[in-house]
């Protein structure tokens, strides 16, 4: 977090920001950005003296006299803030925020010191500064603790609030006082943590020892005693003023903080006394023991504590201190014979500690401080040292086990290999299987480490038996001889016995009616020990009479301890079945300990081979005949105990058995699954499960939820293991049923847990942590993989149930969405505010992270599924968005900023159909502006959080894409849309506008990670695309030039593209992404800019552009062979799986990068037990590595394609925008694009877009050449056309297969258009045709002949299908793809025209005709015209016109026309239904425009064309045509005499055609065809064929009719009608109507003149 500095435009670096940075850097300093680390180190160097000095809270004259704000002054006095020296506090509008920031800064200083002590590498210089002044710092810290304690209770909220009448001010005071109190407690806790690190394993000076003990006695202990009262820490005097607080949570938090402070006081004291963890003893060479005065001071303090201690009152010092002092005194006396202390002086401290239950308090101390392993280590070392002084008994061993098992591995090993421990352990083992003396202590110690347990229990060499009398023992005394390993002589061991016969003994805890006895065979040696004296002494001290003599016989007998333990547990089961919770405490504890031991055995950390072996031992001695357990394994015994404990509500046993089952699940899922199917733990047959009963009747009443937490752990593990392939043999139905029940139980918990009563407040977080993690994992595994495979997952039904739970309709009231929302805004609660800096561990942070992840995933799933409507969860998030922004601005929770921004991004990205919610409305203007200011501060921070920056850029981009116009305008301009004209560039407030920061940050790309730079540039792209005032980027030469420089350097990307390492691939991916964004920006710059001389345009028009660009379009990163082989190998290895099933799908554009490739974590779960996956040998395929590489390869190719598409958009924009002809380099680009399509094709779906991109780019460039008039050499044109011809024949186009149904038309249409353009660019047709005739003819046959044939055949086929269904010609026939077919036909017709326009040779035309005839194209055209009446669009026979247009164009080539005539052209033109309709006559353009068009522009044009080509050869057919259409001809000519005639250009054209037809017929002497042979005397009669035009009289009559229009212009004006849309527009516009009428008049005059002219 960076806080704005008043009077300074740039934010200042804060301790809070540095502390958070160091927290992230602590994991791996080497991975931190070097520049940022240097800035942090510079800050620390400048402020190192202030880290400690500025923490002292005792200051004089803290408030300024000039501050007239009463509330601000009160708070400043409360916090000891000098307002004059703190401008942020003085000028902050939000006092609560300022106070939180002040406390955060104070806490962060300590956090920085702590981080440096833990990880000095962060800043060695500052660490050395602190280390060199270590003990001065320690002294100052102790003084600060004293100061805080001294001032803790001076001010109460009620006394301060009393002076205020304003409720809001009272509320602020009360809240801040409470926050300060807890902040002070945390402050002390932090200091103690630092103190312990600084004095650990050091020789503490005596002045520090004296200072500590003085303050400890006078202040620290009294403070802890007093503050332990809730009203002291919570200030109950003001409870009425803030009823909103959760008093229970605050009470627990208070107790937790105080108990930790008190415990840390103890640890600090132990360390000051010299406990050294490196040597596992107290260092008596410390100054404390060298200085007599100081030593006596400490001794006197402890003696005084012993002497003045009153019954029922806690001592000043923890019993551990007294215990330690007794050890120290004994140790000193042993080393220094002159020591003056006698036994009584030493033992009184030990006795005092033991009287205060020191061991149990040690256990409590360990539990309280378990959040940090350092303290567990200290206590473990203390226990190791104490082995010299205390025995290992049933009770002490229990404490040892609980504490030491939590210590770091090295210290566990040190303890277990300690010489003293080994000696005591050998004595314990010798007494086995005696219960109290040996068995219980050994089992407890075995809980420390499983390896240790197995080593000690697997082979036991002694068996102890107690007997009051030896009379029944048949033995002989012997002296045994053993060999001395250190010498050649033997050693005689006296007083041994040897059994003369077998001895039968009962195993421990065997039932009275059991007949099971253990036989110790004869000849077994042993030793008899008397225990009379020991017992006498003990019992005489208790005032009892001495007992009879008792004997302990230890036999040298080998047996397996595990078997004995298993037998004992079975015996305990029998007792438990009888007595239940009335079972003896000792036996109950033993039962729990054994179950814990078996739990450790089955823990996944233990190898399955080892655990199976031990489980076998444990089951060896079970009584199968008497057991009620099927199979009588130790696991079944524990299951039976679990079932009984559930029935009897024995909570301790329930928890331990559930933990056992959790640990058992990973390796023995089949056993757990079998048990859960039979058990009543979960709901069954409509009956509520015992888990719910325990929750309701036990946990909710006690406030302890350990079992529920353990059951959630079991749920998580069971789901994970059920997905594993190793458990595929277990019934899928069974696993699904169990998982569904576990999830339903988890749902039930989630809906209500938030409001439960808790004894341990952290359990609330733990429950939330497990629930959110379970829900997230289930939903993620199902909805982020291949959607066709998700239903196969056994968790699919549970995932759907979770969706129903969370994504409920908006009008519903459901608990789950409310609970999840409450978690997200929980940092605003007083309790969780106090947890701000993770002082109580990072569990809360984990809960929040899980909850944000779950929430964003749910919204992403909803947004990606069109069937899911906006949910109640989203509605709640919008309603609570203001609170989310409040959390965003909290100083203590800066680590949640990324998650909040990501959530808001998903929220605004999700689609809404109706009632779109506007974020600005929910935030309000004040909160929106505060949000903007915080965001601006984050964007301008001196040391950036790159993840936050990346998330902010994504949020801006998403905001601009969404409909959140109000917030978008605020962020872009710094002002609200209602305030000013947002389209006015002057309305932008540069100080508050995101644009300003984006512009500044865009110049820092070199120092920004590529991933963040890409998101920044993506945001700028959207700004350019959506915001009219975004020209600041275009006008900024620095911005443009910096991007251009990166673009020019992109050539280096391709210096190595083969055999890339993983790191090189990742690096190249990042660079591709960056180049892609730059290119996108340039495309928008060109589009939006009016500057024709811009740097970008000049750059793109450079001669060597080809060298820079051509590589980007070559997508060669995809390793097809590798992917194919990987899929095959995966299938061979795991036949039941498909690798494609694990391919992830992006649910949102936001997480597109994360969800690309294969789901490795899910594969880890599924294949976790397979060594071929986890630990392949060198000879095996490393599938995990190869799949990781495959995912990376897919990502790499994806960005190759994205970059190529970006370049395509830029070149397209440039080509359209360029005002000058393109240079020759673009021709090379076209050739390159076509070659790439030939070489690489698009065999994968992912390559289709780039394949099309190259085709379309080729067309745009060629079209630009055409528009600019640029000439291309014929050789280059031919070269390009040959490449296009090759592409047409490729499998990607598959023209013959697709053209009929117009499939993949986006592939072939740009190619056809490119050919059209190239044909237009041909300058010399004859030479061109000569050079390319063969290829062109082949192309023509493929594309035109076959293309037209296939399209028309498909149309005819559909017509025939419709006809068979009985549709009459009056019905509209629906033809699939007719519009696309029509477009393709017209495009092909254009191609034919272009080919004929280059004047091909006669021979070329003959071959064309032959091709059309042989393919059947001509025939199908004629057939379609015959059926054209059946296809009507808007009741118009559209296909009739198209087919006649084709015939007309084809007839322009004489050889083709001849083929058409031979194919029956005239008969088709005469007899087709459309022609017959026209033959009825009176077809006028105003009433039947389509039919008239077919007649005039189709039939008449074709007949005239044929007549002009073939003359007398087609005269009979032409005369027949005229006779057939005589009525139409007559009506057209005679209608000119009609006063109501509507004059149109179409009518004039038709009349012109008829006049021309009559003249041509006359010229060919058509009358001769009608001369009939008659007598010589008979006169021949003239035949009238073209009625109305054949005679001079008719012509004069028509001329007269035309003259009427010419001589009466107003009349003509009134009779003119339009026949096209263009004509209609001309007539409607007065300015153009007159000219149009004049044109018609001229046309009529020309028609009149033509009547009497020769052809």
From Swiss-Prot:
GO terms for biological process: mRNA export from nucleus in response to heat stress; nuclear pore organization; nucleocytoplasmic transport; protein import into nucleus; RNA export from nucleus. Gene3D superfamilies: 1.25.10.70. It is a peripheral membrane protein. One of its GO terms (cellular component) is nuclear membrane. It is found in: Nucleus, Nuclear pore complex; Nucleus membrane. One of its GO terms (molecular function) is structural constituent of nuclear pore. The keyword Coiled coil applies. There is a cross-link at residue 406 (Glycyl lysine isopeptide (Lys-Gly) (interchain with G-Cter in ubiquitin)). Residues 250-271 are annotated as: Leucine-zipper. Residues 35-62 form a coiled coil. Keywords: Coiled coil, Isopeptide bond, Membrane, mRNA transport, Nuclear pore complex, Nucleus, Phosphoprotein, Protein transport, Translocation, Transport, Ubl conjugation. Pfam families: Nup188_C, Nup188_N, Nup188_N-subdom_III. The modification Phosphoserine is found at residue 340. Functions as a component of the nuclear pore complex (NPC). NPC components, collectively referred to as nucleoporins (NUPs), can play the role of both NPC structural components and of docking or interaction partners for transiently associated nuclear transport factors. NUP188 probably plays an important role in NPC assembly and organization. PANTHER family: NUCLEOPORIN NUP188 (PTHR31431:SF1), NUCLEOPORIN NUP188 HOMOLOG (PTHR31431). Belongs to the Nup188 family. Component of the nuclear pore complex (NPC). NPC constitutes the exclusive means of nucleocytoplasmic transport. NPCs allow the passive diffusion of ions and small molecules and the active, nuclear transport receptor-mediated bidirectional transport of macromolecules such as proteins, RNAs, ribonucleoparticles (RNPs), and ribosomal subunits across the nuclear envelope. Due to its 8-fold rotational symmetry, all subunits are present with 8 copies or multiples thereof. Interacts with POM152 and NIC96. Present with 11700 molecules/cell in log phase SD medium. This is Nucleoporin NUP188. It comes from Saccharomyces cerevisiae (strain ATCC 204508 / S288c). The gene is NUP188.
């Amino acid at each position: 977090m960076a806080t704005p500095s008043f009077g300074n435009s740039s934010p200042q670096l804060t301790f809070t920001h540095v502390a958070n940075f160091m927290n992230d850097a602590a994991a791996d300093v080497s991975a931190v950005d070097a520049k940022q680390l240097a800035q942090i180190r510079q800050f620390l160097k400048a402020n190192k003296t202030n880290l400690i000095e500025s923490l002292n809270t005792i200051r004089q004259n803290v408030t300024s006299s000039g501050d007239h704000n009463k509330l601000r002054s009160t708070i400043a006095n409360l916090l000891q803030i000098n307002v004059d020296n703190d401008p942020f506090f003085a000028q902050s509008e939000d006092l609560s925020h300022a106070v939180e920031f002040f406390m955060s800064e104070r806490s962060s200083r300590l956090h920085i010191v702590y981080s440096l002590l833990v990880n000095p590498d962060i800043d060695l210089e500052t660490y050395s500064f602190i280390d060199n002044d270590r003990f001065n710092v320690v002294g100052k810290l102790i003084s600060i603790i004293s100061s805080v304690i001294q001032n803790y209770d001076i001010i109460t909220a009620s006394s301060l609030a009393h002076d205020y009448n304003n409720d809001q001010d009272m509320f602020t005071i009360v809240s801040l006082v409470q926050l300060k109190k807890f902040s002070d407690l945390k402050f002390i806790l932090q200091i103690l943590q630092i103190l312990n690190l600084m004095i650990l394993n050091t020789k503490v000076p005596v002045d520090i020892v004296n200072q500590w003990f003085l303050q400890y006695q006078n202040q620290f202990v009294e403070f802890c005693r007093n503050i332990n009262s809730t009203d002291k820490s919570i200030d109950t005097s003001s409870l009425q003023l803030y009823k909103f607080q959760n008093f229970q949570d605050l009470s627990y938090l208070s107790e937790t903080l105080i108990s930790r402070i008190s415990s840390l006081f103890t640890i600090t004291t132990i360390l000051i006394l010299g406990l050294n963890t490196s040597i596992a003893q107290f260092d008596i060479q410390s100054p404390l023991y060298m200085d007599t005065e100081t030593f006596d001071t400490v001794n006197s303090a402890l003696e005084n504590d012993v002497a003045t201690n009153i019954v029922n009152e806690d001592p000043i010092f923890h019993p551990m201190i007294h215990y330690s002092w007794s050890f120290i005194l004994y140790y000193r006396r042993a080393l220094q014979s002159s020591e003056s202390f006698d036994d009584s002086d030493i033992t009184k401290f030990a006795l005092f500690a033991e009287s205060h239950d020191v061991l149990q308090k040690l256990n409590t101390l360990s539990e309280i401080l378990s959040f940090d392993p350092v303290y567990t280590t200290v206590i473990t070392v203390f226990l190791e040292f104490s082995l010299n002084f205390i025995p290992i008994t049933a009770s002490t061993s229990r404490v040892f086990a609980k504490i030491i098992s939590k210590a770091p591995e090295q210290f566990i090993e040190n303890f277990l290999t300690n010489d003293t421990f080994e000696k005591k352990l050998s004595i314990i083992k010798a007494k086995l299987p005696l219960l109290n003396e040996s068995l219980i202590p050994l089992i407890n110690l075995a809980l420390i480490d499983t390896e240790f347990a197995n080593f000690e229990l697997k082979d036991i060499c002694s068996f102890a038996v107690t007997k009051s009398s030896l009379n029944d023992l048949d033995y002989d005394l012997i002296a045994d001889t053993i060999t001395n390993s250190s010498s050649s002589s033997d050693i005689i061991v006296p007083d041994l016995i040897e059994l003369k016969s077998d001895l039968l003994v009962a195993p421990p805890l065997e039932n009275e009616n059991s007949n099971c006895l253990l036989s110790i065979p004869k000849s077994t040696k042993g030793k008899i020990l008397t225990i009379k004296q020991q017992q006498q002494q003990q019992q005489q001290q208790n005032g009892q009479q001495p007992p009879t003599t008792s004997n302990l016989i230890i036999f040298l007998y080998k047996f397996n301890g595990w078997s004995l333990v298993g037998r004992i547990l079975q015996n305990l089961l029998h007792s438990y079945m009888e007595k239940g919770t009335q079972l003896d405490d000792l036996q109950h504890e033993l039962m729990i300990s054994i179950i814990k031991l078996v739990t450790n055995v089955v823990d996944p950390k233990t190898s399955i081979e080892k655990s199976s072996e031990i489980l076998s031992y444990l089951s060896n001695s079970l009584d199968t005949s008497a057991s009620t357990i099927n199979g009588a394994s130790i696991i079944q015994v524990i299951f039976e105990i679990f079932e009984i404990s559930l029935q009897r509500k024995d909570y301790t046993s329930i928890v331990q058995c559930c933990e056992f089952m959790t640990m058992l699940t990973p390796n023995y899922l089949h056993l757990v699954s079998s048990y859960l199917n039979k058990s009543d733990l979960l709901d069954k047959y409509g009956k509520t499960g015992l888990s719910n009963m325990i929750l309701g009747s036990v946990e909710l009443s006690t406030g302890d939820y350990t079992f529920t937490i353990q059951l959630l752990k079991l749920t998580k593990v069971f789901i994970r293991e059920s997905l594993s392939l190793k458990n595929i043999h277990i019934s899928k139905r069974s696993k699904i049923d169990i998982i569904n029940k576990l999830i339903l139980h988890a749902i039930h918990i989630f809906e209500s847990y938030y409001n439960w009563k808790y004894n341990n407040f952290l359990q609330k977080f733990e429950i939330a942590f497990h629930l959110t993690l379970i829900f997230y994992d289930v939903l993620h595994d199902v909805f982020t993989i291949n959607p066709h495979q998700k239903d196969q997952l056994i968790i699919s039904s549970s995932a759907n149930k979770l969706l129903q739970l969370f994504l409920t309709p908006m009008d519903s009231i459901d608990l789950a969405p409310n609970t999840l929302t409450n978690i997200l805004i929980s940092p605003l609660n007083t309790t969780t505010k106090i947890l701000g800096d993770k002082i109580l561990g990072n569990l809360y942070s984990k809960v929040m992270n899980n909850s944000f992840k779950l929430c964003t995933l749910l919204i992403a799933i909803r947004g990606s599924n069109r069937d899911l409507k906006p949910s109640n969860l989203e509605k709640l998030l919008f309603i609570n968005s203001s609170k989310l922004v409040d959390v965003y601005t909290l100083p203590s929770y800066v680590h949640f900023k990324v998650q909040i921004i990501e959530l808001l991004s998903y929220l605004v990205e999700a689609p809404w159909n109706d009632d779109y919610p506007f974020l600005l409305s929910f935030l309000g203007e004040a909160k929106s502006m505060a949000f903007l200011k915080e965001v601006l501060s984050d964007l301008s921070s001196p040391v950036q959080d790159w993840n936050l920056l990346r998330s902010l850029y994504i949020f801006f981009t998403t905001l601009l894409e969404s409909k959140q116009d109000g917030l978008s305008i605020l962020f872009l301009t710094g002002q609200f849309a209602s305030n000013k004209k947002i389209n006015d560039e002057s309305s932008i407030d540069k100080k508050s506008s995101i644009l300003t920061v984006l512009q500044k940050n865009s110049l820092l790309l070199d120092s920004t990670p590529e991933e963040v730079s890409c998101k920044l540039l993506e945001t700028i792209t959207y700004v350019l695309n959506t915001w009219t005032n975004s020209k600041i980027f275009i006008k900024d030469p620095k911005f443009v030039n910096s991007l251009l420089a990166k673009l020019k350097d992109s050539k280096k990307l391709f210096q190595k593209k083969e055999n890339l390492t993983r790191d090189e691939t990742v690096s190249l991916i990042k660079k591709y992404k960056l180049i892609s964004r730059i290119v996108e920006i340039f495309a928008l710059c060109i589009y939006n800019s009016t500057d024709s001389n811009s740097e970008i345009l000049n750059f793109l028009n450079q001669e060597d552009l080809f060298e820079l660009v051509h590589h980007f379009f070559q997508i060669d990163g995809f390793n097809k062979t590798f992917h194919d082989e990987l899929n095959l190998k995966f299938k061979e290895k795991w036949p039941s799986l498909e690798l494609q099933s694990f391919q992830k799908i992006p649910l949102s554009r936001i997480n597109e990068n994360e969800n690309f490739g294969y789901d490795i974590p899910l594969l880890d779960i599924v294949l976790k037990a397979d060594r071929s996956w986890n630990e392949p040998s060198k000879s095996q395929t490393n599938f995990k590595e190869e799949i990781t590489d495959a995912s990376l390869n897919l990502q790499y190719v994806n960005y190759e394609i994205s970059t190529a598409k970006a370049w395509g958009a830029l070149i397209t924009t440039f080509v359209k925008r360029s005002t000058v002809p393109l240079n020759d380099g673009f021709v090379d680009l076209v050739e390159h694009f076509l070659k790439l399509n030939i070489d690489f094709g698009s065999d994968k779906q992912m390559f289709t877009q780039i394949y099309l991109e190259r085709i379309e780019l080729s067309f745009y460039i060629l079209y630009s050449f055409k528009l600019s008039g640029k000439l291309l050499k014929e050789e280059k044109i031919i070269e390009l056309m040959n490449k296009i011809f090759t592409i047409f024949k490729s499998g990607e186009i598959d023209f013959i297969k697709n053209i009929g149904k117009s499939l993949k038309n986006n592939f072939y249409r740009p190619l056809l258009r490119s050919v059209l353009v190239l044909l237009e660019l041909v300058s010399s047709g004859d030479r061109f045709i000569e050079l390319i005739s063969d290829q062109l003819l082949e192309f023509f046959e493929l594309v035109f002949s076959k293309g037209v044939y296939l399209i028309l055949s498909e149309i005819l086929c559909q017509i025939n299908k419709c006809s068979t269904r009985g549709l009459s010609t009056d019905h509209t026939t629906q033809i699939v793809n007719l519009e696309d077919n029509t477009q393709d036909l017209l495009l092909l017709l254009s191609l034919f025209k272009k080919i004929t326009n280059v004047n091909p040779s006669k021979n070329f035309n003959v071959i064309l005709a032959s091709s059309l005839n042989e393919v059947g194209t001509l025939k199908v055209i004629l057939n379609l015209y015959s059926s054209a009446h059946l296809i009507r669009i808007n009741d118009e026979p559209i296909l009739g016109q198209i087919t006649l247009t084709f015939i007309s164009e084809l007839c322009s080539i004489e050889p083709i026309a001849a083929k058409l005539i031979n194919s029956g052209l005239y008969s088709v033109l005469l007899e087709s239904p459309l022609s017959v309709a026209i033959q009825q006559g009176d077809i006028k353009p105003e009433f039947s425009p389509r039919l008239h068009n077919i007649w005039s522009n189709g039939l008449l044009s074709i007949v005239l064309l044929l007549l002009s080509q073939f003359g007398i050869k087609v005269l009979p057919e032409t005369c027949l045509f005229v006779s057939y259409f005589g009525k139409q001809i007559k009506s057209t000519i005679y209608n000119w005499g009609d006063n109501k005639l509507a004059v149109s250009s179409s009518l004039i054209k038709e009349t012109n055609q008829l006049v021309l037809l009559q003249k041509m017929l006359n010229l060919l002497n058509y009358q001769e065809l009608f001369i009939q042979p008659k007598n010589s005397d008979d006169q021949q009669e003239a035949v009238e064929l073209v009625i109305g035009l054949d005679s001079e009289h008719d012509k004069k009559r028509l001329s007269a009719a035309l003259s009427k229009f010419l001589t009466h212009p107003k009349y003509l004006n009134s009779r003119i009608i339009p026949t096209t849309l263009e004509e209609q527009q001309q007539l409607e516009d007065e300015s153009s109507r007159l000219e149009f009428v004049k044109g018609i008049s001229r046309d009529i005059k020309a028609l009149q003149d033509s009547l009497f002219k020769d052809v």
